UniProtKB/Swiss-Prot annotation:
The name this protein goes by in its record: Uncharacterized protein YDR029W
Record field: transmembrane: 45-65, 70-90
Lipid bilayer topology: Multi-pass membrane protein
Keyword set, alphabetical order: Membrane, Transmembrane, Transmembrane helix
Localisation: Membrane
GO cellular component, one term: membrane
Amino acid sequence: MSKYYILIELMNDKKNTNSSCDIFSFYLNFSDNPFSSFRLKSRLLYGIFSCFLLFYSLKDLIGVFKQKYLYLSILLLWLLVLLFCLAKGLSHNLRADSFLQYPL
C-alpha cells in the first residue's frame, strides 16, 4: 500500500463517511492503473524522443518552419504522441473484465 492510500483511508475513517474517498483509493492503490504502468511510461518516452529525433532530422530538409512555428509544431507533435500513447494504454489496460474484477 502506498502512503497516499493510507492517508485517504485515514481521512475516510475520520469523517465516518463512504463518500468519494473510495474512488480515490481505487485509483491510487491498484497497480494496473494505466497512468502508473511502466509499459505506458516507456511507450510515452519512446514516442516523445522519436518525434523529437524525426522532427530535428527533417527540419533542415523541410525548410518551411520559421522560428516561431518550430516550438508550436514540437508541442503539437508531443501532444499527439501523448494522446496516442494514452489511448493505447487505456485500451490495453482498461478492458471490460477489469471493471468486473475491481468494482468501484
